[in-house]
A protein has these predicted regions:
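Intrinsically disordered, low-complexity N-terminal extensions of AAA+/P-loop NTPases
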Residues: 1-154
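Interdomain "pre-motor" coupling segment immediately N-terminal to P-loop NTPase/helicase cores
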Residues: 133-197
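Dynamic helix-loop-helix/coil hinge segments at AAA+ ATPase domain boundaries and subdomain interfaces
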Residues: 150-154, 196-219
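Walker A/P-loop
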Residues: 236-267, 278-284
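Conserved catalytic/switch belt of AAA+ P-loop NTPases
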Residues: 300-348, 354
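Conserved AAA+ ATPase "SRH/arginine-finger" region at the nucleotide-binding site
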Residues: 347-360, 367-381
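C-terminal alpha-helical "lid" subdomain
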Residues: 369, 373-438
Length: 438
């Protein structure tokens, strides 16, 4: 096989399983090598294909799925040029065609000789594999199904040009690599290694419609985000207000709503602000829109991290890229804590107004501030009724609201979070008290 001749997709030849399969395709009949060693490598390859398939949730022709997965994850000059934008013209496209011709040889390989050589029909397992279509430890089901569709299409393709078009269309629709195939990310510091932006696999699939009420703040957030994903001017957003009012849920709903339009989100904690420049360097040239998300953001008077954040948002020599915004949630309107004792200290400050402005200037760098207030009693009861109906909870309304009032008095007061916790409590009661339809 010609994997050593790959140019644009050269990183594929570093994949051990592909190398082993390529070696078997060339040498499985070569008597120079011990038969037992060849047979052991054959079974090891089949084992690894099955392991990867079950981990990813693949089904159908697993060999084709494996190759398709390599292609959609390979970040190279061609795939990056095509992500979100589509086919690129010129010499790069011609060089990519050369590689797809080699990939077609892997797709079309006839394994019947190996089966005859080793006397086993085990390859039948991977040609039409029926896996658990509900589970994938790597991708969400939609992306997993798309990769399986790509595998099916490239396996049936008549030419390298057709394979190239199928894969390129995937890049245009979904992107490539970790940023293309995942919604949300976090910063990781593996021991002894550099900072990494890692995909978050298990995300909360909350929708904006799931958040009962708060229509005005939700619409403000939607309007700003839609402008951003459409390439129009948009602002950094600060969502502030009472605890449990849906600030974080709204952010989660935003990424789920606009992921299909190229929106991605990176969660950053306060102690990771020093990594922001490196994060932005990794994402500024990608064809996606990135929200850097900071949850429950606030600073004590002795913390200085807010100064780094100010420089990142606006004020440093390097301009923040057009494909990056910062969204933050906080229970504090002004983010930096102030005490009455600060007034006493400012009596000795010759430029006390400058000190005040220093602490307020971070908030000013968020162009849009959206207030989420706690619901009143009537709004709280409406949230409870909507959530009860949504979860098929059947109780007399008077009893439902009476129990809800008792719950909020004992569990943190009036908020959307308290209402949801009350509903979760009801769902956990003994059957017979509550009827929940399947």
């Amino acid at each position: 096989m010609k994997e050593k001749e790959l140019i644009v997709y050269r990183k594929l030849k570093e994949d051990k399983l592909l190398r082993d399969m390529a070696w078997l395709m060339e040498h499985y009949k070569d008597e120079y090598f011990n038969l037992e060693d060849r047979e052991e490598l054959f079974y090891e390859c089949i084992h690894n294909i099955l392991e990867k398939a079950t981990h990813h949730g693949f089904y159908g022709n697993l060999w084709h799925c494996y190759l398709a997965n390599l292609l959609v994850n390979d970040e190279n000059s061609y795939s990056l040029a095509c992500e979100i934008k589509g086919e690129t013209e010129g010499t790069l496209s011609s060089v990519a065609f050369h590689d797809f011709a080699i990939i077609k040889e892997f797709l079309d390989y006839d394994f019947s000789g190996m089966e005859e050589m080793f006397g086993k029909d085990v390859l039948a397992f991977i040609k039409n594999f029926e896996g658990n279509k509900e589970k994938s430890h790597v991708y969400n089901r939609r992306i997993r199904d798309c990769i399986c569709d790509v595998a099916r299409s490239i396996g049936a393709a008549d030419s390298a040009e057709e394979i190239k078009k199928i894969v390129t269309d995937f890049y245009a629709a979904y992107g490539v690599g970790k940023f293309g195939l995942n919604k949300s990310f976090r910063i990781s510091h593996p021991e002894g290694k550099e900072m990494e932006v890692k995909a978050i696999k298990n995300i909360d699939h909350v929708k904006l419609e799931d958040l009962v009420g708060y229509e005005i703040p939700k619409q403000k957030l939607i309007a700003n985000t839609e402008a951003f994903v459409q390439g129009k001017p948009a602002n950094n957003c600060l969502l502030f207000g009472d605890a449990g009012t849906g600030k974080s849920s709204s952010i989660k709903g935003i990424i789920n709503k606009y992921y299909d339009q190229g929106l991605r989100m990176i969660e950053v904690y306060k102690h990771q602000f020093q990594d922001l420049n490196d994060v932005i360097a990794q994402i500024k040239n990608r064809n996606y829109k990135f929200i850097i998300y900071m949850d429950d953001l606030s600073f004590e008077e002795f913390e200085i991290e807010y100064k780094y954040l100010k420089a990142i948002i606006e004020g440093g020599l390097e301009v923040k890229p057009d494909n990056v915004l910062i969204y933050a949630t906080s229970n504090r309107r002004h983010l930096v804590r102030e005490k009455y004792s600060d007034k006493e200290e400012r009596r000795d400050d010759l430029h006390s107004s400058d000190t005040v402005q220093e602490k307020l200037s971070l908030v000013a760098r968020f162009g849009v501030s959206i207030f989420f207030c706690a619901p009143d009693k009537k709004e709280f009861q409406n949230i409870v009724k909507v959530l009860a109906k949504r979860n098929d909870i059947h109780m007399e309304e008077d009893e439902l609201l009476l129990e809800a009032n008792k719950w909020e008095l004992a569990h943190g007061g009036l908020s959307g979070r308290t209402a949801q916790q009350f509903i979760d409590y009801l769902l956990g009661l003994e059957p017979g008290r509550i009827v929940k339809n399947a």
